[in-house]
Amino acid sequence: VFTRRKSKEAEPSTSTGTQIRRFELEDLDVGMKAIARDAYGSPTVLERRDIDKPEIGDAEMLVRVHAAGVDRGVWHVMAGLPYPIRLAGYGLRAPKNPVIGSDVAGVVETVGNDVTRFQPGDEVFGIGKGTFAEYACALEDKLAPKPTKLTFEQAAAVSISGLTALQGLRDHGRVKPGQKVLVIGASGGVGTFAVQIAKAFGAQVTGVCSTTKVDLVRSIGADHVIDYTREDFAEGEQRYDLILDIGGNSSLSRLRHVLTSKGTLVIAGGETEGRWLGGTDRQIRALLLSPFVGQKLGTFVCSENHEDMIVLKDLIEAGKLTPVIDRTFSLSEVPEAIRYLEEGHARGKVVITLEHNDRI
């Protein structure tokens, strides 16, 4: 929105004997461009708008967005499905925040009174609120300095997918050097990080993906790659110490069949059409069964925190982790980007890029 503030009065003109009022350009509040919606639904509910910049709290920062990542969580928040998403604070009947998007990379514009780690001008990456916009609000504890070797587009691809992979393997999978790890969904956003992080921890990694993505998974370090269109991982003789299931929908019995007797299964994904559970029924069954078997079966919710963002940053700067970007889209193309991801085309991450010199 363009808002004209009260004009400032100029000195009287001596040449005409009349007073002149002039408007100064700096008194125009430009606002920002954003992709917003008023209702839950498909990508058709999204539209480009001129809106006010977000206001920040004492522990927050205003970030000028250079790039924003797209992940499955974006689709869930956009659609309001499964329904528990709405109960988690996103709005019961209509979305509370019209702008979606979480992954962000950009430059700090302003900081709140309690912010100590960052100052205006710092390049950062992490997790914000409403990042499909020219400016986004973010908590200090959910950002980290952008790795110098990454572009803004690469940095925007890291946070949510990288944290999910890191915590799934390290905290819930307890991965150790020499273990055999199976990553199901190895070519996706989380999967491409998981393969590299498991290798960084010294594991022997097998990735599961489709035919067209085999070369990609092999190129990022997988020791073995299973093309699920030609081979069923559950029918082989190999047993795994840890399975990270990101994109699959295999039954618990099939997954347990290829686990060692004391192995660990971590479910971090898998979608169904259910409007209430949306695939989480499998996670729930795993949690209920785990106490009664020798194997550890479970799931988790990613923790968005500064400390683990620094771990990812260190892995990147050590050359052990590189974001895999499939395609980039402009801010105006956010609906197309979400459709592309939803249809399963992505090899790695999908990223939204913003050019601030071009007002879209």
Task: Give names to the regions the model predicted.
Residues F2-R4, Q19-V30, S303-I360:
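C-terminal hydrophobic helical "lid"/dimerization subdomain
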Residues I246-L321, L354-I360:
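Glycine-rich phosphate-binding loop and adjacent beta-alpha segment
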Residues G128-E140:
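A structural motif shared across PLP-dependent enzymes of the aminotransferase-like
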Residues E123, K180, G263-T264:
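Short glycine-centered segments of the SAM/dcSAM-binding site in methyltransferase folds
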Residues A155-D227:
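Mid-domain Rossmann-like dinucleotide-binding core that forms the NAD(H)/NADP(H) cofactor-binding site
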Residues D52-G69, Y83-G130:
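Glycine-rich beta-strand-centered segment in the early N-terminal region that forms part
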Residues E235-L242:
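A short acidic, Gly/Pro-enriched loop at the edge of an enzyme's catalytic core
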